[in-house]
Amino acid sequence: MNKHLPTMVPRLAARFVLGIAVFALATGASVMALRAQGAARTVWNGVFTAEQAAQGKAVFENKCATCHGAELNGGEMSPPLAGAMFVSNWSGQSVGDLFTRIHTTMPQNDPGSLNNAEVSQVLAYILSFNQFPAGAAPLPSDDASLGQIGITDKK
């Protein structure tokens, strides 16, 4: 009989239990992360209304189109707000990030002059123009809510 057997069995059992515990924790953390990702809203979840986008079009035409163009294709000094370039530039960021950029830096000749509702309307128009679907509830105007909505090119 092996003289180390009495101490080996408890050690092996302890290692086995520890291995199971680590596996369970890792699996649980992975499942929770996947659930959190699945629960996150994106621009593909109908985060604005068609009415809000129509209101945003009017604001855009009045305050933004001079620089960004009627087709949102950008200009000499202005980035495009439509198409693959726009989505690529903002993919992985939140609608809140875009809201903050517009609110604090636009329009270029009068930064910060748009109120929160106008910025949300313009955002709704930009999203609509980029073929993201409208939904039943309007896009909110607060950073906390907007920060929970991701911009992505994937549905």
Residue ranges of each PLM-predicted region?
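Generic structural signal for alpha-helix termini and adjacent loop/cap motifs
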Residues: 70, 104-105, 129-132
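Flexible coil segments in periplasmic/lumen-exposed cytochrome c-class electron-transfer proteins
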Residues: 40-41, 109-155
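Bacterial N-terminal signal peptides
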Residues: 15-30
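The canonical Cys-X-X-Cys-His
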Residues: 56, 60-70, 122, 126
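Electrostatic cytochrome c docking/interface patches
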Residues: 34-59
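Gly/Gly-Pro-rich "capping" loops immediately C-terminal to redox-active cysteine motifs
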Residues: 46-55, 72-107
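N-terminal secretory signal peptides that target proteins for export/translocation
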Residues: 1-14
